[in-house]
């Protein structure tokens, strides 16, 4: 199938509120994952023994953000960039990312008073080269993905100018990532494969923005909710991930995901196992016309169930609480799919509530970490399950308020001053 990269843009751009719901859900999963880690950040004197409510979907959420970013950029720039439009493109991208990021960086420096970074590290963050030139400040650790975003935005410029097919560029990016990951131990540079594999996700969103038409009738909200529950489940119920990992070892004779001591934010070869899930979620949330959408969703729901067999055969789960939440989410994903008609009203209500969160999702994603670090330094009112619960509530409220102020007050003011 020949993918047409540049088509005549639609005369009317319709804002997709369902995508806002997806953004909101992904950002909530990131902050929930960070808040529920057993590291005494939320409550310095208490950490739950059986942390059954922790989810490890933060990394998956970032992958979804990358796919979403490529998709949105593709919709916003259906025509090739020219020397007259590149400046405006760069300006819009920087204004969208940098002002909020810079304010959160200042807050992160305040939160780092016990482990203040060096001037070189601060300079690396100001220039957004952290993770490449300097270590990443823990109090703003989610910022690693913003560096990826900036690089992807820059790489989009030649793709657009020269009308390159993003599908072919994605395949080339996979090859570059695999070759460099294979020889990573020889030349000691795991950065390139990480960016290459991350770019595959971004390009996949760009491809999706150029292909498939929108359905005449929208996809049921129950399917959207099923996708979100499935997204929560697949980090622990990772049979597709494990299968892909083993195929990779069989093909290359080694684990391409094991590089060197590169730590925060690395995107590895094995993450490609989640690319089909990310794409299917985006297809469903954008009402794309794809053959056998329902059957494909059912297949993706069924695959993780083989994880239970693997756990049973190898007796890997000594602490059953660790799979309680993923199993519950998995059951809800299947129920929303199987009983779509019965849960449609409730699913529509929940998705529309998440739409409101999507408008502050970037602010939530970047500001919650400095707030969490600040809370870890407050020792009063801590040490019990009750204080933990109250602190969790305060953390969520503070993060939402800060994100609202950044997105709805500060960002519009900055745009007004710079345009």
Where are the predicted features?
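C-terminal ends of transmembrane alpha-helices
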Residues: 40, 131, 177-188, 233-244, ...
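Extracytoplasmic catalytic-loop and juxtamembrane helix elements of membrane-embedded
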Residues: 48, 119-129, 195, 243-261
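Membrane-interface micro-motifs in multi-pass membrane enzymes
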Residues: 59, 140-148, 194-199, 267-277, ...
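Small-residue-rich segments of transmembrane alpha-helices in multi-pass membrane proteins
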Residues: 96-100, 201-205, 229, 304-305, ...
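Hydrophobic alpha-helical segments of polytopic membrane proteins
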Residues: 162-175, 204-231, 292-307
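Loop-centered beta-sheet repeat module
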Residues: 180-207
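Alpha-helical transmembrane segments of multi-pass integral membrane proteins
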Residues: 235, 239-409
